[in-house]
């Protein structure tokens, strides 16, 4: 049994040269090493969604990141997803595979506007049946707030962001 908690990072901008994540392969390597040192054993690369995204390019970059981790001796599982800013057609994009869920699961990382309250989120996502949502907000203090449970007794839980990955 290990003394260290093994974690899954479900929101990582580790693909080099994509959006606001790692700028190059060297930076990606440093992020992988920092994640490994903190007990992360599975990283879901989540570049920002765009209607113009080249899915094949994302898959090739994911394969490259997996190979880089292997060369560094890091037994990291690397999966693909997307950070999805809510828009009306998003459920259709998910159903058609034009937007990615987290690691090909039924879960999606969906961002709503900071001012959107729970009722707005519930109204916008209420029809989704095949995909569960992880709506979140990034606060100025670096805290993600995820909707933990839907329904009248819903509550929000704050999760600290992997701080050393922010600094890397």
Where are these regions (language model features)?
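An N-terminally biased module of ancient metal coordination in phosphate/nucleic-acid-related enzymes
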Residues: 1-76, 153
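Feature captures the catalytic cores and cofactor-binding loops of soluble hydro-lyases/lyases
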Residues: 168
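Active-site neighborhood of phospho(di)ester-bond hydrolases with catalytic His/Asp-centered motifs
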Residues: 8-10, 43-47, 79-83, 138-139, ...
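Extended substrate/RNA-proximal surfaces in nucleic-acid metabolism proteins
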Residues: 55-160
């Amino acid at each position: 049994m290990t003394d260290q908690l093994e974690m899954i990072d479900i929101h990582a901008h580790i693909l080099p040269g994509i959006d606001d994540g790692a700028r190059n392969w060297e930076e990606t390597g440093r992020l992988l090493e920092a994640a490994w040192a903190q007990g992360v054993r599975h990283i879901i690369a989540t570049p920002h969604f765009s209607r113009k995204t080249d899915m094949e390019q994302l898959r090739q970059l994911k394969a490259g990141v997996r190979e880089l981790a292997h060369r560094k001796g890091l037994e990291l599982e690397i999966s693909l997803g997307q950070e999805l800013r809510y828009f009306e057609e998003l459920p259709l994009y998910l159903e058609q595979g034009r937007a990615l869920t987290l690691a090909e699961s039924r879960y999606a990382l969906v961002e709503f506007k900071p001012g959107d309250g729970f009722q707005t989120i519930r109204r916008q996502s209420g029809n989704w049946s095949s995909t569960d949502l992880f709506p979140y907000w990034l606060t100025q203090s670096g805290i993600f707030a995820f909707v933990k449970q839907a329904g009248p007794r819903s509550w929000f839980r704050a999760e600290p962001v992997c701080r050393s990955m922010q600094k890397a």
